[in-house]
C-alpha cells in the first residue's frame, strides 16, 4: 500500500471510528452524531461530554490529553481509543480521562 493510500486508509478508519462511537452513544443520547472531519472541538455532538475519538497506531496519551485540555470545555472530557487490531465493537475500546 502506497503512502498516500495508507494515509487515506487511516483517515477513513478515524472517521468510521467516530461514526461507530456516535452510534453506540445513541443508546443513551439519541442526538449523538459524529462531527466528521476538519472541525474544532468535540468529535461527537449531542451528548453532555467533550469527546475526542482516536483510531491509533501509536500510543501517545500525553499528546491527546494536552489536545483535549486545550479546548477548555466546561463539559466532562474524555478520549476514546480504538487501537490497531480492534474491530468496531465499541465496548472493547479504551477510554482515558484527562
For the regions a protein language model found, what residue spans apply to each?
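Catalytic phosphate/metal-binding cores of nucleic-acid and nucleotide-processing enzymes, i.e., regions
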Residues: 1-96
